[in-house]
Design a protein with these regions (language model features):
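Conserved, well-structured ligand/cofactor-binding cores
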Residues: 1-487
Length: 487
């Protein structure tokens, strides 16, 4: 266990296990300090988005407890004001990370983070009342209207229902406020390219081999549709995340809370955030399992797969510049090699693909965290901090990668129309359009001879006089091959 730094000034706080030296200027107390000493694992605290969501939740809980007649107006207002400071990032106190230091790899229920929030809120109230940090358990202070971390901030709650609730709230807010808008912007750019480039005909490719022609706009309309469908999947993820565990307290029975508490807090969160939340239909399922969270993470996996497909296709189509496909001209954003002068690499595409890989890894960790016998054991899941941190990282990475992809690549992406036309004319797949006129076998033989003699399908068909020239011109028009027959 880490030892105390003798140079750090401390104050003495107490919890149910006794006295604990705590750094003098931090807002947390004894329970949090024990967790700091117990879990020196990764050096990563819970994400800021999660801490802010916890503060939003604690505020809603206080307001509902007042509405139910369990908490007086003065304490409710004090707790709400403290939560506002946390939501704003505690900039006057050195930032969230300083006061929410508990490692991601902590107790699997997230109890340490819940107590961290309770203690910070209570100590912010102490400061607001002109009392020193650490006064929140002083009897005289409490009799005078002070706020206790457990009795008031945590009233009607348990770590076992607040932490899973904060998981859903933080994930839903991040998806709704960060990822969906980023995908709106990405979809708009892809759709813009699809419309602008619909006149450009190029060769299609299946199995990385030449296929029949396709319009560049058609390809990009497919990419735009992928993102539109991803947005639909995200909407469904928001729906499963909207169900909250709050109100179940320790094991789902609701001991020590009001029967309407969970419902009213969900309504308060909806009003405050603009994202819809509702009380869980079954609190035992909501606390004992994490199926909804796995489903939401799986949605992010599907979204990542879509992004990887688009980025990889553009990387292939931009390969070259002289010896690759070269149908797209990728913007040069940085030198690509320390040994090959003038080389420019598809670094933005590579970054997006790496993000997708990381999201898939995060999803696997989330899935394991919900797996029976690993995280989900009897009446509580005990891998929640890790699950929450991984899913929130996935949302952040996907949102940032989407904007980066759009700003640093798509907006300045250009087609090489001459290259597209040249590759179509040289493709053996052009013979496909002759099948209705001369049959499959003759078309296949034509393609074979054209390949062997280094000629285009058009040149050889004219030489062999297989069809009248006007008919050949009509059948070998590349654009006509990009639509179904009219009849």
């Amino acid at each position: 266990m880490p030892t105390h730094d003798a140079n750090i000034q401390t104050r003495i706080e107490k919890d149910s296990m006794g006295e604990m030296p705590v750094p003098a200027d931090v807002l947390y107390g004894a329970s949090t300090q024990r967790a700091v000493l117990n879990f020196p694992v990764s050096g990563r605290g819970m994400p800021d988005a999660f801490i802010r969501a916890y503060a939003t939740l604690k505020r809603a809980c206080a307001e509902v407890n007042q509405k139910l007649g369990r908490l007086d107006a003065e304490r409710t207002g004090a707790i709400a004001a403290a939560c506002d400071q946390i939501e704003a990032g505690l900039s006057d106190h050195g930032g969230l990370a300083r006061h929410f230091p508990v490692d991601v790899f902590q107790t699997g229920s997230g109890t340490s983070t819940n107590m961290n929030a309770n203690e910070v809120i209570a100590n912010l109230v102490c400061l607001a009342r002109g009392e020193p940090i650490g006064s929140s358990k002083n009897a005289a202070y409490l009799q005078a209207g002070g706020v206790h971390p457990n009795d008031h901030v945590n009233m009607g709650q348990s770590s076992n229902d607040t932490f899973p609730t904060a998981m859903h709230v933080s994930a839903a807010l991040a998806i709704a406020h960060d990822l969906v808008p980023a995908f709106d912007r990405l979809h708009a750019e892809l759709d813009k390219k699809a419309q602008a480039w619909d006149r450009i005909v190029k060769i299609g490719r299946t199995h990385l081999q030449d296929a029949t022609p396709i319009r560049l706009g058609q390809e990009f309309s497919g990419y735009a549709a992928q993102i539109a469908q991803a947005k639909g999947r995200l909407a469904r993820a928001l729906d499963v995340l909207s169900e909250l565990a709050l109100g179940g307290t320790a094991v789902g029975t609701g001991i020590n809370t009001h029967k309407d508490f969970g419902r009213l807090v969900a309504e308060a969160l909806t009003d405050r955030t603009g994202v819809r939340f509702r009380e869980a239909d079954n609190h035992f399922e909501a606390q004992h399992a994490k199926d909804a969270f796995v489903e939401a993470s799986g949605t992010l996996r599907a979204v990542a797969v879509a992004l990887s497909k688009i980025a990889n296709d553009i990387r292939w189509l931009g390969s070259g510049p002289r010896c690759g496909i070269g149908e797209l001209k990728l913007p040069a954003v940085q030198p690509g090699s320390s040994i090959m002068p003038g080389k420019v690499n598809p670094v933005i595409c590579e970054s997006v693909i790496m993000v997708a890989c990381q999201v898939l890894g995060n999803d696997h960790a989330v899935t394991l965290g919900a797996f029976g016998g690993v995280g989900s054991v009897l009446d509580l899941n005990v891998a929640m901090p890790m699950m929450a941190a991984n899913l929130l990282e996935s949302v952040r990475l996907l949102a940032n990668a989407s904007d980066m992809f759009r700003e640093n690549l798509l907006e300045n992406l250009e087609p090489d129309e001459e290259r597209c036309a040249a590759l179509i004319e040289g493709s053996l797949a052009m013979c496909t359009s002759l099948v209705p006129a001369i049959g499959y076998d003759k078309s296949a033989a034509l393609a074979y001879v054209a390949y062997r003699e280094g000629k285009t399908v058009r040149e050889l068909a004219l030489e062999q006089k297989l069809l009248p020239e006007a008919e050949l011109v009509r059948l070998l028009d590349p654009r006509s091959m990009t639509e179904p027959d009219a009849e």
